[in-house]
């Protein structure tokens, strides 16, 4: 199980690197989906299944809409792929900066902590996941409204960016 969690963490980092290092949104969306699945799988392995499901649905629902509109705006006949030298160099430089930051920053000493899952406290404890469901529906209502309003505003901003000069989002095919 430990190796699986480490594998999910590696997939999460590689997915984020794929989104950050690729200038073409055609291939960047693959990195986004990989990072989202790995991050939610990581939460799922810790026992927080409801939060993982909500984050997966909200994150992919909101971000894939933005990627669809940016793909329609980019419309390149020959998009740059991950195998291009510029993209590979950018990814290698991001990994180098990350490794140097971890080594120089002294974070290697703090890797000794253990992971506590939600069922490790005892038989009479309430699972954190069930407490999260109650918090989502009681105290989190305002945050859900703010997040929904932000996603709606982002949708209108992207629609305005894709609109073009005169005809709106409709283009000649």
UniProtKB/Swiss-Prot annotation:
It catalyses: a ubiquinone + NADH + 5 H(+)(in) = a ubiquinol + NAD(+) + 4 H(+)(out). The keyword Nucleus does not apply. This is NADH-ubiquinone oxidoreductase chain 6. The keyword Secreted does not apply. GO terms for molecular function: NADH dehydrogenase (ubiquinone) activity. It comes from Alle alle. Its main location: mitochondrion. It is an enzyme of class 7 (translocase). It is found in: Mitochondrion membrane. GO terms for cellular component: mitochondrial membrane. Core subunit of the mitochondrial membrane respiratory chain NADH dehydrogenase (Complex I) that is believed to belong to the minimal assembly required for catalysis. Complex I functions in the transfer of electrons from NADH to the respiratory chain. The immediate electron acceptor for the enzyme is believed to be ubiquinone. Gene3D superfamilies: NADH-ubiquinone/plastoquinone oxidoreductase chain 6, subunit NuoJ. Its EC number is 7.1.1.2. Keywords: Electron transport, Membrane, Mitochondrion, NAD, Respiratory chain, Translocase, Transmembrane, Transmembrane helix, Transport, Ubiquinone. The chain crosses the membrane at residues 1-21, 27-47, 48-68, 87-107, 113-133, 139-159. The gene is MT-ND6.
């Amino acid at each position: 199980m430990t190796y699986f969690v480490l594998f999910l963490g590696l997939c999460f980092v590689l997915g984020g690197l794929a989104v950050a290092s690729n200038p073409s949104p055609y291939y960047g969306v693959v990195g986004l989906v990989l990072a989202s699945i790995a991050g939610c799988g990581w939460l799922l392995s810790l026992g927080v299944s409801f939060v993982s499901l909500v984050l997966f649905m909200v994150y992919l629902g909101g971000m894939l809409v933005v990627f669809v509109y940016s793909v329609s705006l980019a419309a390149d006949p020959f998009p740059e792929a991950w195998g291009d030298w510029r993209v590979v160099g950018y990814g290698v430089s991001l990994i180098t900066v990350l490794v140097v930051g971890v080594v120089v920053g002294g974070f290697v000493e703090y890797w000794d902590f253990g992971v506590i899952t939600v069922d490790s406290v005892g038989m009479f404890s309430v699972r954190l996941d069930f407490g999260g469901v109650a918090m989502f529906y009681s105290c989190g209502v305002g945050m859900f409204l703010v997040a929904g309003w932000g996603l709606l505003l982002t949708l209108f901003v992207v629609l305005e960016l894709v609109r073009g000069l005169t005809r709106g989002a409709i283009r000649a095919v």
